[in-house]
Amino acid sequence: MIKPRRIGHATFETPDLPRLVDYYTEVMGLVLAERDKDRAFLATKIGQLAIQINKGDVERCTTVSFEVAPESDFGALARELEKDGIKSELRNDSVPSIGPVLTFKDNKGTTIALFKEWSYLGKHLAHHGIGPLKLGHIAWVVENPAKTAEFYSKVMGFRVSDWISDFFVFMRCNSDHHTVNFIRGTVSKMHHMAFELKDFIHLQNSCDLFGQRKIPIIWGPLRHGPGHNLATYHRNPDDQVIELFCELDKMVDEELGYFEPRPWHQDTPQRPKTWEAGKTSNWGPPPTPEFHRARDAVAAQPAQH
């Protein structure tokens, strides 16, 4: 079993590379670590690679990387994947700060890249914009969330943190409540991507920046139920939904089996569970129509997450 330690970076294709680079540097506050004609690599202010952008015909997320333990044997992992009928390839993609990667496709067609060697990219460089701490999680629309959850559990060692009814599952690979989410829909695509901020003041400052730049907040601020994170949502120039969050639940001891207690928890202790649809926020406004716009691939569901 693979057992990732954390999410690394996500790779996107875009028809307008300069526009998206400008958004991630000037608005999101990521650091442009390296760039050539058709690619750009962006790191957090801490120095971890977070986003790779490739020039392409369609706006989409193609690859997600995960860090595995430094002693991991890629040959042994490849043999384990082969037993599950999954083809893998050991590659060196010349990604700044990342060593060789073992790549394979998950059951929805996204490339997964495992790495065990990495280095910092100019940490603590001056930045503009928001300056998130890290890439926190990615959510996907999938036809069968239970089937995808089974793949991520059996093949990659993820654990289920929560369900909303039977259509939305949250999964973790470390202490963070979720690193991947899967919601039921008719066409597989990214639902949203999330960056972690330091605290509520950091989140408030990001809202002020959105106001200055006339970027609409399409949901929030609010406190979610599953994960209990404070969050806001907006769209980037490629019309993809971006979440900013802080105060996410943590499972600090897997054997105890409950999330680290917080005053806003409604269950004591707060354990993984199935939430009732439509009752999954502690407080805050409902999603705006703009949040749901162009999400025709998602089957009709009650208000989510």
List the predicted regions and their residue ranges.
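N-terminal beta-strand motif that seeds the catalytic metal site of vicinal oxygen chelate
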Residues: 1-18, 48, 61-66, 118-146, ...
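Core segments of cupin and vicinal oxygen chelate
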Residues: 2-5, 9-49, 93-95, 103, ...
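Vicinal oxygen chelate
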Residues: 6-15, 56-131, 134-143, 169, 215-305, ...
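Conserved active-site tyrosine of GNAT-family acetyltransferases
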Residues: 20, 24-25, 81, 109, ...
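Alpha-helical elements of the RecA-like P-loop NTPase motor core of helicases
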Residues: 21-22, 51, 75, 112, ...
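Glycine-centered loop/turn motif at secondary-structure junctions
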Residues: 28-29, 82-85, 156-157, 214
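Conserved short beta-strand elements that form part of the metal-binding/catalytic scaffold
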Residues: 29-62, 106, 110-118, 161-191, ...
